Regions:
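Metal-dependent phosphoesterase/phosphodiesterase active-site architecture
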Residues: 1-63, 68-86, 134-135, 141-143, ...
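Core catalytic region of metal-dependent phosphoesterases/phosphodiesterases
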Residues: 66-160
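Catalytic-core regions built around general acid/base machinery
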Residues: 108-129, 321-344
């Protein structure tokens, strides 16, 4: 949307670092790993478990109804049987405003909050989850809004209502302040603590020893903050990596493959990409692959590296995310050598495209070959359709093009007028026991068609 301002990547990184006191002396003294958390639910060592996935949810009511609330109510039917929820970003539209968290997040997902009284909704910056609600930021969670535009929207709202012109409810006087609202909701927001308060806080909440340092102890119902905008946790001997793709979703002029292959970063790299995060992911994937106690790996991020949705198939942000993630995976293969399995990662989960899609890459000639890609971005925002001309993703190969990924299943907007169908979705993923786990992916659909809502569970995918 043209009136929204996407801050520079360097600004996103700097502001988010300041909010979590990145690499502060108090962190170094205690050997704290600010990218690691441990879910303290007493069940994290069990090998068979289930979790939920949704994304692009916080849109609020639409002219025909409230799909976000419908999906949230359906989601609640699976909550008791699942250990945690992964949110793939765009938590609140259009620009992550604090003014919209009550209506577009807190109220729909009260079942996930310790305080569930509709008359006493908690403040957005004091939320406490009764089950792990693990998010990564999307582009809308970072957007800013020009002050003048916000005032114009507010001033014109009464006139639009009088003239019976649709009113944009997802635009208020404020934007996200470069992700500040998201950080206050989900992250361990440390910037405002005194040195004494910080010391006491770290002693109380960073208590889990891991091979990478002291980790944040995530306690459902007691302390439910994330240590950083990107992070890792281990559950059921599977490593989960949550990424902030909004800081590596823009093209750069250089080839990053040799950068990621090198042992150390150079000092003259372009600032419009998050090299630190990409190197972190590279190193953590290598360590995970070399750890005999880890039996699988799942990555989740906002921007889908592979997608056939009509508005995202050729989007620069998605193409950049693919290119940069590929650099990382190629570097991982180079470091692990002949021991590198195929695929390197068991599942890659994303959002951004307003649909559900399952794709599989072919032999791309890179570290992202033969991977399973699940796009889960149809949980509340306006749905989009599949590109009408293709069900594959192609790349230039010299003067020709070649297929690099094939869509296996697409669930999105269909038809028009009286024949229009709007299937909103979320996923339940059942992780089975075993040295090499299988994943039973169960898509749940709440469809609006012919002025009626229906619920269904699609056939499971065995991955």
């Amino acid at each position: 949307m043209g009136f929204l301002l996407d801050p520079p990547i360097s600004q996103k990184i700097q502001k988010m670092r300041s909010r979590v006191r990145w690499n502060a002396q108090a962190m170094r003294e205690r050997a704290i790993d600010q990218t690691r958390l441990q879910i303290a639910d007493g069940l994290a060592t069990t090998s068979a478990f289930s979790f939920l996935v949704m994304g692009d949810s916080g849109f609020g009511p639409q002219p025909f109804g409230h799909p976000q609330q419908v999906v949230a109510d359906y989601l609640a039917t699976q909550q008791a049987d699942c250990r945690f929820l992964l949110h793939t970003g765009d938590v609140v539209y259009q620009m992550g405003s604090p003014d919209l968290y009550a209506a577009n997040f807190i109220e729909p997902y009260q079942q996930w909050l310790v305080t569930g009284d509709r008359d006493q909704l908690p403040s957005y910056c004091r939320l406490l989850f009764n089950q792990p609600f693990l998010a990564v930021p999307g582009n809308h969670d970072y957007y800013n809004l020009p002050t003048l535009y916000g005032f114009l929207v507010a001033a014109l709202r009464p006139l639009r209502q009088y003239l019976n012109v649709p009113v944009t409810k997802n635009v208020t006087l404020r934007g996200s302040a470069t992700g500040d609202t998201y950080a206050r909701v989900f992250l361990d927001y440390l910037r405002e603590l005194s040195p004494e308060q910080l010391t006491a806080h770290l002693q109380q909440h960073y208590t889990t020893a891991t091979e990478t340092g002291q980790a944040l102890t995530y306690q459902p119902g007691s302390f439910t903050r994330l240590p950083n905008r990107y992070y890792q946790f281990r559950y059921g001997d599977i490593d989960f990596f949550g990424l902030d793709s909004s800081t590596f979703n823009r093209p750069v002029e250089i080839d990053g493959a040799p950068v990621l292959a090198a042992r150390e970063l150079g000092s003259d790299l372009p600032a419009n990409i998050d090299w630190t995060q990409l190197c972190w992911l590279r190193d953590r994937l290598v360590a995970s692959l070399q750890n005999p106690q880890v039996r699988g790996r799942i990555v989740y991020l906002h921007h889908p590296p592979y997608i056939t949705e009509v508005t995202k198939l050729h989007e620069t942000a998605c193409l950049s995310a693919r290119r940069h993630l590929r650099w990382v995976l190629d570097a991982v293969v180079q470091r692990v050598g002949n021991e590198a399995p195929t695929p390197l990662i068991d599942l890659v989960l994303s959002g951004h495209a307003h649909c559900f899609e399952y794709l599989r890459t072919v032999d791309t000639g890179h570290g992202d070959r033969e991977l399973n890609w699940l796009v889960c971005g149809g949980s509340g925002a306006r749905l989009r359709s599949q590109h009408p001309d293709t069900t594959t993703v192609e790349e230039a190969d010299g003067v020709d093009t070649r297929v690099v990924a094939k869509s296996q299943l697409f669930v999105g907007r269909q038809g028009a007028g009286a024949e229009k169908r709007l299937p909103y979705s979320f996923l339940r993923i059942d992780v089975q026991a075993g040295d090499r786990p299988q994943f039973v992916v169960r898509p749940f659909v709440a469809e609006y068609a012919q002025e009626t809502w229906t619920r269904s569970e699609l056939p499971s995918l065995m991955l």
